[in-house]
Amino acid sequence: MAENVPADVNTLSFELAIEELETIVKRLEDGKVALEESVAIYERGEALKRRCEELLRRAEARVEKITTDASGHVTGTEPLDVR
């Protein structure tokens, strides 16, 4: 893949997506990017943010709390309620 062609957001791991998002935030905060490019990277940043949120939701759904009996023996699992 060419360096100037960004990867499809939907194929990125959480770690790669968050790393790219952090880079975009830094570039926008520096204020040295032309208007059109700023808009384009902002839009990519929004897509990356959505990707990260989706991956976090999926991970949260997979996290389970281990249940134990009175003596501390594992009896099973149940969905973790983080609310």
Swiss-Prot record:
Subcellular compartments: Cytoplasm
Gene3D superfamilies linked to this entry: Exonuclease VII, small subunit (1.10.287.1040)
Name the InterPro entries on file: Exonuc_VII_S (IPR003761), Exonuc_VII_ssu_sf (IPR037004)
Q: Which family does it belong to?
A: Belongs to the XseB family.
Task: Briefly state the protein's biological role.
Answer: Bidirectionally degrades single-stranded DNA into large acid-insoluble oligonucleotides, which are then degraded further into small acid-soluble oligonucleotides.
**GO MF term list:** exodeoxyribonuclease VII activity
Q: Spell out the protein name for this chain.
A: Exodeoxyribonuclease 7 small subunit
Catalysed reaction(s)? Exonucleolytic cleavage in either 5'- to 3'- or 3'- to 5'-direction to yield nucleoside 5'-phosphates
Top class in the EC scheme = hydrolase
Q: Which species is listed as the source? A: Nitrobacter winogradskyi (strain ATCC 25391 / DSM 10237 / CIP 104748 / NCIMB 11846 / Nb-255)
Q: What is its main location?
A: cytoplasm
> EC?
3.1.11.6
The record's PANTHER family line, in alphabetical order, gives: EXODEOXYRIBONUCLEASE 7 SMALL SUBUNIT (PTHR34137:SF1)
* HAMAP family per UniProt: Exonuc_7_S (MF_00337)
